[in-house]
Amino acid sequence: MKKQKIRFYAALLCSSMVLSLVSMPVSAAETGQLTNPPTSTEGPGSPESASGNEAAAVLNGLYAALPVANGVKEVATADELTDALADSSISIITLKDDVEISSTLTVNRTVTLDLNGNVLKMTGSDSVIKVEADGDLTIQDRNTTTQHTFNPHCKYQFWYIDMWELDKDGSKIVSGGVITGGGGDQNNGGGVLVAGGTLTMAGGSIVGCSARSRGGGVYLAYDSATGKSGTFIMTGGSIIGCAAQLGGGVYVAPECTFAMATGS
C-alpha cells in the first residue's frame, strides 16, 4: 500500500513539473516578454527531441507574429511596405532597409512611418506619399547616424535650378532616414502630397523631390470632396534641395495649415 502511494505521488509530482514547463512559453507570450526558445539536448531521433523541436517551432511562430500583434511591422521591400500601410492592425511601420517604389504610397488611416536611417526612393514620376483626407501620417527616424550622399547640382528639368540627387559620390551628406526622388513631371507635391489629411514630421529628411507647379517637398491641398484641408505639423526633420515653380520646400494652399515648431 505504501509503495502504491509513493508511485502515485511520484507520478503526480512529475505531471506537475511537466505542466509547469509547458506553461512557461504561454505565460511569457501573454506578457509580451518572450525569451529565446528552449533547445533540446536529446538525440535527434528521441521523442523528447521531437517535442522540443515542435515547441521551438511554435515559439518561432510567436516571434514572427509578435511585431504585428504589438502593432509594429518591419518591412524591407516595396510590396511589404504597401501591404503594411493597408493593414489597419499595424500602427508603426519601420524600414529595415532602403526601399524603392515605382508608384505612390497612399495613406488613408492613422499610421507612423519610421525611416530608421534608410532611404525611401521613388523611381517613378509621382509623389512618394499621398496622405488622403482620412489619413494621419507621422514620419519619424530612430536612426540619425546613417549617412547618405547627394549631388547638390542636379538641374531640375523644368526650371533648370539646382536640386539635390542621391549620388554615392555626392559632396553633400544627409544623416538619418531620407525620402527622395518624388515628383518628376507631376504638378504638385513631389515628396508628400497632403490631400486633406494630416502630416506630422518628427524626423527624417525629404531631399531632392520636385514638382512642375507647387510644393517640391510637401504640398498641402484642400480636398473638395470631403471638405477637409491639409495640415502639416513639423516638429523635426528637414526638407532639403527640393524644387518647384512655387514652394520648392513646402506649398500651403488656401485653407490649409502649416505649423513649424522645429526642423529645417
Regions picked out by a protein language model, each given a short descriptive name:
Residues M1-K5, T41-E42:
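N-terminal secretory signal peptides that target proteins for export/translocation
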Residues T112-L115, D136-D141, V174, T198-I206, ...:
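All-beta strand scaffolds that present successive hydrophobic residues in beta-strands
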Residues M24-D87:
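Low-complexity, acidic Ser/Thr/Pro-rich repeat tracts that form intrinsically disordered stalk/linker regions
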Residues Q4-V26:
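Sec-dependent N-terminal signal peptides of Gram-positive bacterial secreted proteins and lipoproteins
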Residues E100-T112, L120-T149, H153-E165, S171, ...:
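Extracellular beta-strand-rich solenoid/capping regions of secreted or surface-exposed proteins
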Residues V75, A84-I101, V111-N116:
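Glycine-rich repeat segments that build the extracellular carbohydrate-interaction surface of secreted
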